[in-house]
From Swiss-Prot:
The gene is rplV. It holds the Pfam family Ribosomal_L22. It comes from Rhodopirellula baltica (strain DSM 10527 / NCIMB 13988 / SH1). GO terms for biological process: translation. Part of the 50S ribosomal subunit. This protein binds specifically to 23S rRNA; its binding is stimulated by other ribosomal proteins, e.g. L4, L17, and L20. It is important during the early stages of 50S assembly. It makes multiple contacts with different domains of the 23S rRNA in the assembled 50S subunit and ribosome. The globular domain of the protein is located near the polypeptide exit tunnel on the outside of the subunit, while an extended beta-hairpin is found that lines the wall of the exit tunnel in the center of the 70S ribosome. Keywords: Ribonucleoprotein, Ribosomal protein, RNA-binding, rRNA-binding. The keyword RNA-binding applies. This is Large ribosomal subunit protein uL22. GO terms for molecular function: rRNA binding; structural constituent of ribosome. GO terms for cellular component: cytosolic large ribosomal subunit. It comes from the Bacteria.
């Protein structure tokens, strides 16, 4: 069984928001997952959809996997990881000379596909 990965590093969305969508597609076939994400209203669904398409493209590239091209119907999402990335820290001035910290969070999205034969 072959493993194909795709990454989106430093995605400008918090990991918590993407994990909600990632839990929906974990364990699905790649074509079903893309159909599911197409109708999700969350912004994280668009980002995850692009990463899955990239992983499918890696699986269909014959140069990367010794001359074989895998069909999208035979690919299963076995690994979806959404980890926290670096934070941009900003200062927001408040009353009486105080300042509040604003944390603009980012995330690293990783998708792993596995080829299943005879589906």
């Amino acid at each position: 069984m072959s493993q194909f990965n795709a990454y989106h590093k430093n995605a400008r969305i918090s990991a918590q928001k993407v994990r909600l969508v990632a839990d929906l597609v974990r364990g699905m076939f790649a074509d079903e997952a893309l159909d599911t994400l197409k109708y999700q209203p969350q912004r994280g669904a668009r980002m995850l959809e692009k990463v899955i398409k990239s992983a499918v493209g890696n699986a269909q590239d014959p140069d990367q996997n010794s001359g074989r091209s895998h069909r999208i119907e035979e690919l299963v999402i076995t690994d979806v990881r959404v980890d926290g990335g670096p934070m941009f820290k900003r200062i927001q001035p408040r009353a009486r000379g105080m300042a509040f910290m604003i944390k603009k969070r980012s995330s690293h999205i990783r998708v792993g596909l596995t080829h299943i034969e005879n589906v």
